[in-house]
């Protein structure tokens, strides 16, 4: 729709229609015809105020206040942000698909390498999306080799955001439990740490050009954290060393699974985004030992260690796709390293275990009176172990027998079981249960005050 134009003549017409009785009764065409003759007889000085009013109205129309939502935010700004977010997500998906299809085109999809990264943080700024980092881990992964390399470091930011100490203590206490500054562990030179991280990421992409952006993957939960922590590290650097893009690892798993099935001629019938996303949500390798840093191993917080987090992501990829490509999983690369159990399970009822560990003579007796079957194992040098097997499905009891249900016979009769209107005639309306208290006699309430004998 073309913008509305203002001129001095129409301002004169509107004023004449508002201030004169004849103008209020006339329609717009009649007012234009009537005012046209007057406008022709007016000189430039007389037309000046109306031309000025037209210019002011045009300026005011350009400076109209934008529509706001209930939070006082501009609707146009929100729509623009939504469009930008949708465009970023579309670019992310296209780039992820391009990386996977490039490996498929080379017929080397199992050797295509990806970089996974995760941050732990102390606190988040309330005014922007900057996080104060506490720990960083990144690894290079491929389906064929598993975890190729890993970079991990604790971070000492030196100081926290003023006024957010309580929030920081609450967050760290319920997550990674790393010591707070000034007692924080790890690298304190943020500029050097950022340079080392960029150097490692570039080493994982030897074919990339110096000006190409670096692509790392993280879950949607960690994507804003990784972005905010990289912004914090970059702020202490003299100049930006690289452009780092953080993409969705869940979408990478979905696309990679589809291309793996297509490369081995397996028709996709069950793979969808919900199925692949649930693998990260369930986190089946969450409580495995030996995949986190030594500090979190000692305090038993392996679940929140970034080294453990990225390792579990790699294990999810391997567990979900190595079987399709006939890749033999290796402990520590495609699956958690094997751990010697620090406990012993003893089950005397397991006949196969008992017979394999020791030589024993097994006898079976049946008690006809009770219907119980008892297994007795006699072992030289050991005490006799007895285990009785009960058939809980075969149960019969008498509901009136006190020995089967002893609680039934222990119940006492309730006192004052007689109704309030026991001495009234059958037709008396006061025998009704809902008679108001004002219409009842004192005698009706006698039973209510009789206490049972102690």
UniProtKB/Swiss-Prot annotation:
DNA-binding region: 2-69
Location (main, coarse): cytoplasm
Cellular location(s): Cytoplasm; Nucleus
Biased composition (Low complexity): 350-370
Keywords: Cytoplasm, Developmental protein, Differentiation, DNA-binding, Meiosis, Nucleus, Oogenesis, Repressor, RNA-mediated gene silencing, Transcription, Transcription regulation
GO biological process: germ-line stem cell population maintenance; male meiotic nuclear division; negative regulation of DNA-templated transcription; oogenesis; piRNA processing; regulation of miRNA-mediated gene silencing; regulatory ncRNA-mediated gene silencing; spermatogenesis
GO cellular component labels: cytoplasm; nucleus; P granule; perinuclear region of cytoplasm
Disordered: annotated span: 336-374, 405-433
Entries under InterPro entries matching the protein: HMG_box_dom (IPR009071), HMG_box_dom_sf (IPR036910), Maelstrom (IPR024970), Protein_maelstrom (IPR039259)
The UniProt record lists the keyword Phosphoprotein: no
Molecular-function GO term, any one: transcription cis-regulatory region binding
Function summary: Involved both in the piRNA and miRNA metabolic processes. As a component of the meiotic nuage, plays a central role during oogenesis by repressing transposable elements and preventing their mobilization, which is essential for the germline integrity. Repression of transposable elements is mediated via the piRNA metabolic process, which mediates the repression of transposable elements during meiosis by forming complexes composed of piRNAs and Piwi proteins and governs the repression of transposons.
Family in the record: Belongs to the maelstrom family.
Name of the protein described by the UniProt record: Protein maelstrom
Species of the source: Drosophila mojavensis
High-level lineage: Eukaryota, Metazoa, Ecdysozoa, Arthropoda, Hexapoda
Name of encoding gene: mael
């Amino acid at each position: 729709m073309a913008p509305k134009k203002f001129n001095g003549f129409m301002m004169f017409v509107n004023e004449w229609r508002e201030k004169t009785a004849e103008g209020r009764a006339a329609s717009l065409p009649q007012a234009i015809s009537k005012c046209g003759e007057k406008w022709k007889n007016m000189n430039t000085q007389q037309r000046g105020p109306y031309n000025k009013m037209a210019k002011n109205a045009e300026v005011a129309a350009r400076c109209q206040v934008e529509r706001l939502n209930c939070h006082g935010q501009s609707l146009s700004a929100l729509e623009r942000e939504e469009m930008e977010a949708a465009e970023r997500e579309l670019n992310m998906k296209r780039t992820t698909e391009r990386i996977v299809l490039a490996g498929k085109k080379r017929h080397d999809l199992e050797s295509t390498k990806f970089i996974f990264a995760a941050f732990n943080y102390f606190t988040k700024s309330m005014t922007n999306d900057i996080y104060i980092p506490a720990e960083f881990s990144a690894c290079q992964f491929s389906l064929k080799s598993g975890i190729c390399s890993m970079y991990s470091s604790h971070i000492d930011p030196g100081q926290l955001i003023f006024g957010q100490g309580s929030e920081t203590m609450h967050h760290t206490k319920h997550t990674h439990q790393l010591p707070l500054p000034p007692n924080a562990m790890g690298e304190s030179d943020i500029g050097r740490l950022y340079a080392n991280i960029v150097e490692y990421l570039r080493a994982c992409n030897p074919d990339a050009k110096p000006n190409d952006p670096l692509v790392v993957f993280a879950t949607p939960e960690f994507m804003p954290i990784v972005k905010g922590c990289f912004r914090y590290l970059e702020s202490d650097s003299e100049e930006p060393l690289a452009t780092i893009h953080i993409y969705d690892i869940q979408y990478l798993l979905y696309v990679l699974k589809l291309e793996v099935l297509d490369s081995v001629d397996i028709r996709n019938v069950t793979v969808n985004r919900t199925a692949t996303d649930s693998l990260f949500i369930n986190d089946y390798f969450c409580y495995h030992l030996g995949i986190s840093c030594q500090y979190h191993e000692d305090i038993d917080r392996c679940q929140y260690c970034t080294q453990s987090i990225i390792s579990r992501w790699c294990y999810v990829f391997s567990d979900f796709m190595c079987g399709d490509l006939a890749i033999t999983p290796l402990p520590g690369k495609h699956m958690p390293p094997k751990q010697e159990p620090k406990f012993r399970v003893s089950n005397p009822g397991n006949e196969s275990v008992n017979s394999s560990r020791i030589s024993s003579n097994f006898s079976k007796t049946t008690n006809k009176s009770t219907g119980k079957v008892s297994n007795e194992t006699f072992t030289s040098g050991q005490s006799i172990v007895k285990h009785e097997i009960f058939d809980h499905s075969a149960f019969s009891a008498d509901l009136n027998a006190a020995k089967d249900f002893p609680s039934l016979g222990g119940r006492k009769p309730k006192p004052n079981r007689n109704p309030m209107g026991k001495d009234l005639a059958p037709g008396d309306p006061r025998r009704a249960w809902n008679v108001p208290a004002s219409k009842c006699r004192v005698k009706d309430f006698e039973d209510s005050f009789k206490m049972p004998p102690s």
